[in-house]
Design a protein with these regions (language model features):
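Glycine-rich hexapeptide-repeat left-handed beta-helix
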Residues: 9, 15-17, 23-25, 29-30, ...
Length: 145
């Protein structure tokens, strides 16, 4: 989405199909720490995702930070403003909150379905935005001063 920074200058960044990276996120890598985001993932506004692996169908909440070498499993929900520290491994189907992030429970089928629905809504938004794009022209006498 608009305003996201993805710096793959040191290691590669891979984002899976139907995943969305929302406004003001920063995705970056370090030497030896590529960044992989699985399919059907939602990365919330202003999250910082750094040299880690995020499994399929996972939602990382707004303002969360995931650091080098962290591995988040499939079908996880990382709460807003959570901090996933370097090298931390989060099991599949986990709800994680806090700084540092702690698993507080296992997600049930309804919660996992909601993660999938979130990613699908953003796919539909992308289609809607793309179909409504129009070229904007400045008037010849435009003066930004």
């Amino acid at each position: 989405w608009f305003g996201t920074v993805m710096r793959g200058d040191i290691e590669p960044i891979r984002v899976g199909a139907r995943s969305n990276i929302q406004e003001n996120c920063v995705l970056h890598t370090d030497s030896g720490f590529p960044l992989t985001i699985g399919e059907n993932c939602t990365i919330g506004h202003s999250a910082i995702i750094h040299g880690c692996t995020i499994g399929d169908n996972t939602l990382v909440g707004m303002g969360a930070t995931v650091l080098n070498g962290a591995k988040i499993g499939k079908n996880c929900l990382i709460g807003a403003n959570a901090l996933i520290t370097e090298g931390k491994e989060i099991p599949d189907n986990s709800l994680v909150v806090g700084a540092p992030g702690k698993v507080i429970r296992t997600l049930d089928d309804a919660a996992i379905a909601a993660l999938t629905a979130s990613a699908h809504r953003y796919v539909e938004n992308a289609k809607r935005f793309a179909s409504g794009l129009v070229e904007v022209h400045r008037p010849a006498d435009f003066d930004p001063a």
